[in-house]
From Swiss-Prot:
Protein name: Solute carrier family 7 member 13
A molecular function GO annotation: protein heterodimerization activity
Main location: membrane
Record's function text: Associates with SLC3A1/rBAT to form a functional heterodimeric complex that transports anionic and neutral amino acids across the apical plasma membrane of renal epithelium. Preferentially mediates exchange transport, but can also operate via facilitated diffusion. May act as a major transporter for L-cystine in late proximal tubules, ensuring its reabsorption from the luminal fluid in exchange for cytosolic L-glutamate or L-aspartate.
Positions in the Extracellular compartment: 36-47, 111-129, 185-208, 264-288, 360, 417-423
Length: 478
């Protein structure tokens, strides 16, 4: 555990610019760019020029949201800052409902990713049919507990894995991009004409264009990840903006060049009909390296699994520090990792893997994530008005805040209007069910004596310790 001259025990601030930039890149670049970057093209009416413009617009929209999150993470530099920020702006009830969502959405997402990773690992052994469910579940559970062990070793131990994953993703996309540019310069006439006449196809309607922007915006999701680990970054007021202005332009260039490369080799119709665009591209251009694409997809899923466990555990950590979860969940092991929080997440995800039918229901909670994001942006405006003298080392440009709020509210309202489903009612009922626990445990502060004994026993069993209050928290409370 981290101990300074005053023997304080807390999460270490030991992550710098290079780690933060890698963290942002691997959060944004997922398996989607290898498998199905065709949603934007499809909703752009297969207009190549419009689809590339949409990718660029989505990058700008993502930048506005990322900078809003940066203000939160820099003003309140704690791990799990988005939870703390909601509590600061809207009170303990809203923060608890945010926590209540994370307790189920986090493990649900992790279980889904583990099963998908297992499917890519098992399927090659069953070339003529679908892989049986039992081997997939066993492999998913094995990978999940490996991820749990890695997370329990602390953030610093994940650096090498994160660097390898980042180099792998950007490297393979770089090969695709550079090969595409080479083919564009020295390629066939029809390939060159496809991009020269990029805007000749029919222009999409406004509704289609909006849908294309949503598709692209989802591909850039993850730009607000620094609020989860702000408490472990060195000099967050400098590190976070630098990482955003380095990582996001790099991802944008890679996305644009990869799409140009795909469109140089494949027609729009071929892209839409392909189940894995990068695999089709590689099979046509460099057939000897077709195996690299499934490998890159598996690596992307694995590192995203690691990062999602890390981010969810930090929400439980700060909720425990703020008294909305037992102190046990912020207890740190010798590697400065919230071990019990990680253990709970892995255990819940394991149960969901066994009971696969529950994962689809939990994934509907994604809808609620946009609500929390919108509330966070509203909170920025609220604090600007109520606490104008609050120390803010970084302030996002106000028009960016309104742009980010507009796109986030659209993500909430358009699904409700366009395709209302009964599941959304279930989501709201689930959200309200958090009150059953909030009222007795948080509002009336009901305590269980046996849990205090359990806390002492588990501290001895796992060699974990409750952290001290950091200087940041002392300053904030004063």
């Amino acid at each position: 555990m981290a101990m300074d001259s005053k023997k304080e025990i807390r999460l270490k601030r030991e992550l710098g610019y290079f780690w933060g930039t890698n963290f942002l890149i691997i959060n944004i670049i997922g398996a989607g760019i290898f498998v199905s970057p065709k949603g934007v093209l499809q909703h752009s009416s297969m207009n190549v020029g419009v689809s590339l413009c949409v990718w660029a617009v989505c990058a700008v929209l993502t930048l506005t949201s990322a900078l809003c999150s940066a203000e939160i993470g820099i003003t309140f530099p704690y791990s799990g800052a988005h939870y703390y920020f909601l509590k600061r702006c809207f009170g303990p009830l809203v923060a608890f409902l945010r926590l209540w969502t994370s307790l189920f959405l986090g493990p649900g997402l992790i279980a889904s990713q583990a099963l998908l990773l297992a499917e890519y690992g098992v399927q090659p052994f069953y070339p003529s049919c679908s892989a049986p469910i039992l081997p997939r579940k066993c492999l998913a559970l094995a990978m999940l507990w490996i991820v749990g062990i890695l997370n329990s070793r602390g953030v610093k131990e994940l650096s090498w894995l994160q660097t390898v994953s980042s180099v792998l993703k950007v490297g393979i996309l770089g090969v695709i991009s550079l090969s595409g540019l080479f083919l564009l310069v020295r390629g066939k006439k029809e390939n060159v004409q496809r991009l020269q006449n990029a805007f000749d196809a029919e222009f999409p309607e406004v509704s289609q264009l909006i849908e294309a922007i949503f598709q692209g915006y989802f591909a850039f999701s993850g730009g607000g990840c620094f609020t989860c680990i702000a408490g472990e970054l060195k000099k967050p007021s400098k590190t976070i903006p630098r990482c955003i202005f380095t990582g996001l332009p790099l991802v944008t260039v890679v996305y644009l060049l990869a799409n140009i490369s795909y469109l140089t080799v494949l027609t729009p119709q071929e892209m839409l009909s392909s189940d894995a665009v990068a695999l089709t591209w590689t099979d046509r251009v460099i057939p000897q390296f077709t195996w690299t694409v499934p490998f890159a997809i598996s690596a992307s899923l694995f590192i995203n699994l690691v990062i999602n466990v890390l981010e969810t555990s930090r929400v439980l950590y700060i909720a425990s520090e703020n008294g909305q979860l037992p102190l046990l969940f912020c207890a740190l092991n010798v590697h400065s990792s919230p071990f019990i929080a990680v253990l709970l997440i892995i255990s819940m995800a394991s149960i969901l893997i066994v009971l696969t039918n529950l994962i689809d229901l939990i994934n509907y909670l994604y809808f609620v994530v946009s609500i929390w994001t919108a509330l966070s942006i509203i909170g920025i405006l609220k604090l600007r008005y109520q606490e104008p003298n609050l120390h803010r080392p970084y302030k996002v440009f106000l028009p960016f805040t309104f742009i980010a709020l507009g796109i986030t509210l659209s993500l909430v309202l358009i699904p409700l209007v366009k395709s209302p489903k009964l599941h959304y009612i279930y989501v709201f009922l689930f959200l309200l069910s958090g009150l059953v626990f909030y009222v007795p445990l948080i509002h009336f502060k009901v305590k269980f004596v046996w849990f205090q004994k359990l806390t002492c026993y588990l501290q001895l069993l796992f060699n974990i310790c409750i952290p001290d209050v950091s200087d940041d928290h002392i300053h904030e409370e004063s």
